[in-house]
Amino acid sequence: MQDNLPQIWEKTLNLIKPELTEVSFTTWIKSIEVISLEGNTMILGVPNVFTKDILTARYATLISNALKQTTSKNFEIRFIVPSEEKISKTEESQKKLEGSVNISVASDQFVSNNLNPKYTFDTFVIGNSNRFAHAASLAVAESPAKAYNPLFLYGGVGLGKTHLMHAIGHFILQNNPKAKVVYVSSETFTNELINSIRHDRNVEFRNRFRTIDVLLVDDIQFIAGKESTQEEFFHTFNALHESNKQIIISSDRPPKEIPTLEDRLRSRFEWGLITDIQPPDLETRIAILYKKAQMENIDVPNEVLTHIAKKIQSNIRELEGALIRIVAYSSLTNSEITVELASEALKELFSSKARQLNIDLIKEVVANKYNMKIEDFNSKKRTRSISYPRQIAMYLSRELTDLSLPKIGEEFGGRDHTTVMHAHEKISKDILADDNIKEKIERIAKEIKGD
């Protein structure tokens, strides 16, 4: 029977298809891959954990019954995510290895394995908001260390910075499979540094990051205020740059606006090309949704894609999340995808966004916390009871909105952008130095966001 599994599965699919809507069949069933037959258990591969959970909860019985009709036998169904199975086996092997030898930070299995296979240049949707960043990324991928070094990408959350970084890594590896490409978040870099210090393996750590061809570091802003991490990254940067190796960095803001970042790092980040990514316009948002639906092999009416794109303007992650939510809702209710269904599926999402997060709201919440008048934020008063809450409000405006420094300055009585930058840097330092201040500002931020 093992040899006949493809034919058996084909017949099973033909029995299942009439029982479901086209959307449900395409979304959940079509992506299933027959892996093997182990006794009376059919092993079926699925693309991700979310799909696995849905299939287990809603469709396992349907599939089992269809298999019984096809083969006249009872089968247990087990869904697996093949990529996760491989990872768990690798981790198990690594644990066994670590049990018999000293743990080493260095590895020939470079972090290129961490590159998301979906994040390539082919799947990146180009629009006016990201055209220059895309062109710069492609130039770097085509000629590592010759075009722009470093390449510094910045922009808000979920706008495509990580996608472009992964795409660069994939492109380089495709053209040179032997290239040593490391993709790492700044948090991971910090954690690995801490572990290397704890276990006295600094040499291995440095070898890992300084003997490579391409280093991609995501969310570099999180090393701000971490002296040891900045020190190590400074020397790593120098070693790679002097060896003519490519460095790509991403952040949520340009180098000059990252608080408590050492000047020597700031200047090095500015050696190459700095390019930003802005929120996508309506046409680009529709194109992104169309591309996502195409990749997932889902048929979604154009009017629904337009409806989503008009409602969600913030970032790509939320756009794609809304599309997945609508498809899941359609499948779970066994209904066709329409604008009405989309509105119903997303009503909770939209209602939670009803309270507009803007500077007026930030001023209102901060003013209530510090017993001050709203107009005091725009006044010239410099007493600490006024100036410090004003700095907190400026800090939160920078952290919680996408407004530029000059625009924030305008909202606070026409102040210069350097005043906003100073306020942000001061509060950032206070947060690092004083846990009470950190907790208080976190509480204010949660209240502003409605958490």
Curated annotation (Swiss-Prot):
Region (Domain II): 73-113
Region (Domain III, AAA+ region): 114-330
PROSITE patterns the UniProt entry points to: DNAA
Compartments reported by the entry: Cytoplasm
GO BP, sorted A to Z: DNA replication initiation; regulation of DNA replication
Domain I, interacts with DnaA modulators: annotated span: 1-73
Pfam families assigned: Bac_DnaA (PF00308), Bac_DnaA_C (PF08299), DnaA_N (PF11638)
Record-level Gene Ontology MF annotations: ATP binding; ATP hydrolysis activity; DNA replication origin binding; lipid binding
Keyword terms: ATP-binding, Cytoplasm, DNA replication, DNA-binding, Lipid-binding, Nucleotide-binding
Region (Domain IV, binds dsDNA): 331-451
Origin: domain of life: Bacteria
Annotated residues for binding of ATP: 158, 160-162
GO cellular component term of the entry, any: cytoplasm
Family statement: Belongs to the DnaA family.
Domain notes: Domain I is involved in oligomerization and binding regulators, domain II is flexibile and of varying length in different bacteria, domain III forms the AAA+ region, while domain IV binds dsDNA.
Subunit and partners: Oligomerizes as a right-handed, spiral filament on DNA at oriC.
Chain's role: Plays an essential role in the initiation and regulation of chromosomal replication. ATP-DnaA binds to the origin of replication (oriC) to initiate formation of the DNA replication initiation complex once per cell cycle. Binds the DnaA box (a 9 base pair repeat at the origin) and separates the double-stranded (ds)DNA. Forms a right-handed helical filament on oriC DNA; dsDNA binds to the exterior of the filament while single-stranded (ss)DNA is stabiized in the filament's interior.
Protein name: Chromosomal replication initiator protein DnaA
Organism name: Alkaliphilus oremlandii (strain OhILAs)
Originating gene: dnaA
